[in-house]
Amino acid sequence: LTYYTPEYETKGLLLHXHRMSGGDHIHAGXVVGKEITLGFVDLLRVALEACVQAR
């Protein structure tokens, strides 16, 4: 069972942006795909830090 939290909403939005940017997929915490997605892990980290600070 998965419980709804703001973190899931943030990740969903970032995953959507990742797909639109041409990324292939995310596997084991690393981005696999085109070079344009190299900074995607940094975006996830920043979003997660913002969610943690908001608590």
UniProtKB/Swiss-Prot annotation:
<comment type="subunit">
    <text>Heterohexadecamer of 8 large chains and 8 small chains; disulfide-linked. The disulfide link is formed within the large subunit homodimers.</text>
</comment>
<keyword id="KW-1015">Disulfide bond</keyword>
<comment type="function">
    <text>RuBisCO catalyzes two reactions: the carboxylation of D-ribulose 1,5-bisphosphate, the primary event in carbon dioxide fixation, as well as the oxidative fragmentation of the pentose substrate in the photorespiration process. Both reactions occur simultaneously and in competition at the same active site.</text>
</comment>
<dbReference type="GO" id="GO:0004497">
    <property type="term" value="F:monooxygenase activity"/>
</dbReference>
<keyword id="KW-0460">Magnesium</keyword>
<keyword id="KW-0602">Photosynthesis</keyword>
<dbReference type="GO" id="GO:0016984">
    <property type="term" value="F:ribulose-bisphosphate carboxylase activity"/>
</dbReference>
<keyword id="KW-0488">Methylation</keyword>
<dbReference type="GO" id="GO:0000287">
    <property type="term" value="F:magnesium ion binding"/>
</dbReference>
<keyword id="KW-0456">Lyase</keyword>
<dbReference type="InterPro" id="IPR036376">
    <property type="entry name" value="RuBisCO_lsu_C_sf"/>
</dbReference>
<keyword id="KW-0120">Carbon dioxide fixation</keyword>
<feature type="active site" description="Proton acceptor">
    <location>
        <position position="18"/>
    </location>
</feature>
<feature type="site" description="Transition state stabilizer">
    <location>
        <position position="34"/>
    </location>
</feature>
<dbReference type="GO" id="GO:0009507">
    <property type="term" value="C:chloroplast"/>
</dbReference>
<keyword id="KW-0150">Chloroplast</keyword>
<keyword id="KW-0601">Photorespiration</keyword>
<keyword id="KW-0560">Oxidoreductase</keyword>
<dbReference type="GO" id="GO:0009853">
    <property type="term" value="P:photorespiration"/>
</dbReference>
<dbReference type="GO" id="GO:0019253">
    <property type="term" value="P:reductive pentose-phosphate cycle"/>
</dbReference>
<comment type="similarity">
    <text>Belongs to the RuBisCO large chain family. Type I subfamily.</text>
</comment>
<keyword id="KW-0113">Calvin cycle</keyword>
<feature type="binding site">
    <location>
        <position position="19"/>
    </location>
    <ligand>
        <name>substrate</name>
    </ligand>
</feature>
<keyword id="KW-0479">Metal-binding</keyword>
<feature type="binding site">
    <location>
        <position position="27"/>
    </location>
    <ligand>
        <name>substrate</name>
    </ligand>
</feature>
<keyword id="KW-0934">Plastid</keyword>
<keyword id="KW-0503">Monooxygenase</keyword>
<protein>
    <recommendedName>
        <fullName>Ribulose bisphosphate carboxylase large chain</fullName>
        <ecNumber>4.1.1.39</ecNumber>
    </recommendedName>
</protein>
